[in-house]
Amino acid sequence: MKLFPMSSTKYYIFLFNFLLITSTTLSKSNFQPKTLFLLVKKDPSTLQYITQIHQRTPLVPLKLALNLGGESLWVDCQKGHKSSTYKPARCESAQCDLAWSTSCGNCYENNTSLPICNSCYNVVSNPVTSTTGEIADDVLTIQSINGSIPGPVAIVPNFIFSCPTTSNLTQNLGKNVKGMVGFGQQSPVSFATQFASIFKFSRQFAICLSSSTKRNGVIFIGHSPYFISLAFDASRDLIYTPIITQQRFVTITYPHYISVIRPSPEYYIQVTSVRINGKTLPLNKTLLSLDENEEGGTRISTNVPYTELEPSIYDIVSKAFINEMPKEVKKVPSVQPFKTCFDSTYIGVSRLGYDAPEINIVFQKQSVYWTIIGSNSLVKVKEGVICLAFVERKEATGQAIVVGGYQMQDNLIEFDLSRRRIGFSNSLFYRQTMCANHNYA
């Protein structure tokens, strides 16, 4: 089996081709937005973060789950899909290359205009499984921002996405959710990268996930400022750590059966240590480093509701957290999926959440760290019981730390792909605001 790495030169050639493909969009727009936005809300049943776009002709509203490490947008086209502007990507076209095609439809009939004939496919996935998807493009609309208020709607006539070849890929998503919107790094057709290429703004986006299942948070795509309230730009408080880029092996079946090395769309960062109430924990440093097989290290994921820790790391964090809890707060039996739980009768509560030990996630040096406070470290599971909102990793292999959605709630997190860095704001509660306090509804 042959191995072919994707060079950075080829990657940027793909981006250049993409600019040519989307040039018609600019001629049809009367404005050049600098920032776009999506509203996003936590689904109470799946704990996934759900947003909505409008796609197709005529336009149809589609609920989609947020996938930080996803390569692209995918939408279920199996049930009731109708669009006069849907265009499948033809084999060996620029769209196929951009969307990292892994195979191409074979023609067994004379009619080569059939969508399933001469169309290319890639891999699409949900948090549990994956399948193949037909690469295509169609009309998509998204709201722009004018300062701290909504601006005009941006219309993209040929946004690249994928249609899974089976309808069961939505089974692990929330009710009426029709797909996933991928914001993965290094992917030429990720949601943010396509808009940056089309409207010629910086490749960056920021998420502000609300802790409420009834009120929306917001996803910003494009330039800051990121106004969470009328007078507060949350991007001013960011501390940055580099994004780690990684490669992975992918099997391609067309035009030849080969294995290629492609960039991973996942977001990896280097965590050097963890402190609880200022005390550095004795973690295995080897586990904190990402290896060539994407094992170890730290990944950021919205597909994980609560931060997952490798078992030995979980034990150390849990014991240290228990030791630093107020003495009057007693342990109680575990409540799945959590192992470390407490009686909440005597724990204090402030605007920062529960009176819990402060957790510092330390990045490239001791002075650069992200602080997790009580509102993000403890979760109420039932009346009178709260639990440490971290879980032990079940799989034998994987990341040492996977930062989950609960820990990101009411924090602004910026993904600056142009500068290869991620910015963390710390809890917006310090600023007496929260992610639901925006003015974009």
Where are the language model's segments positioned?
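Cytochrome P450 catalytic domain signature, combining two hallmark sequence patches
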Residues: 81-105, 195-197, 203, 232-241, ...
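Short acidic, Gly/Pro-enriched loop/turn segments at secondary-structure junctions
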Residues: 148-150, 282-285
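Short Pro/Gly-enriched beta-strand edge/turn motifs at strand-loop
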Residues: 32-37, 115-125, 189, 253-256, ...
